[in-house]
């Protein structure tokens, strides 16, 4: 694998977001403020994107990341739905995920470059990742105040996507054959979903106040 500082930085920030999420749930022994629906969507993203994990070896780095994303995502769902189920805020976590999944399936069949199962699933995962955070954002909007570790988790998720945009720009400038408009568009949409969140997160840090969404 060619060393790419921007991609590695993005991946490290993504891992940091997972650390914040699991630390919040395990150390506080609750999943208050965490959307189970978003976590399920992210798990679907990783499963459909990494169908080739058992037969397509690109690099040890890539394989380790795939395993980490799959296992931590499944573990997070277990913690929310089983171990700390009594603290799950199902009253506010109400977005119907099928409103996100079905359009992504349709778009995957329209925009896939190859009608193989792995390619259709990969394309589907790109679309779904762009909107998987929506249940989480809507849950936080409905409750208002955001816990510290929750805010760090979501901030890192947004930063990870922003760093990937820089990575794409870098690759486009340095690799002649690099062309991935679908990834760029979906990744940009995903990053835009975090813009308002970034604003209020940074504002609360600068002012030393609690992080509250309007």
Swiss-Prot record:
PANTHER family (UniProt xref): ER LUMEN PROTEIN RETAINING RECEPTOR
Cellular component GO terms held in the UniProt record: cis-Golgi network; endoplasmic reticulum; endoplasmic reticulum membrane
A GO biological-process term: protein retention in ER lumen
InterPro entries in the record: ER_ret_rcpt
Transmembrane portions of the chain: 5-23, 38-55, 64-82, 99-112, 120-139, 152-170, 182-202
Membrane topology: Multi-pass membrane protein
Zinc listed as a keyword: no
Cytoplasmic-side segments: 24-37, 83-98, 140-151, 203-214
Name of the encoding gene: ERD2
Name of protein: ER lumen protein-retaining receptor
GO molecular function, one term: ER retention sequence binding
Record organism: Entamoeba histolytica (strain ATCC 30459 / HM-1:IMSS / ABRM)
Subcellular location: Endoplasmic reticulum membrane
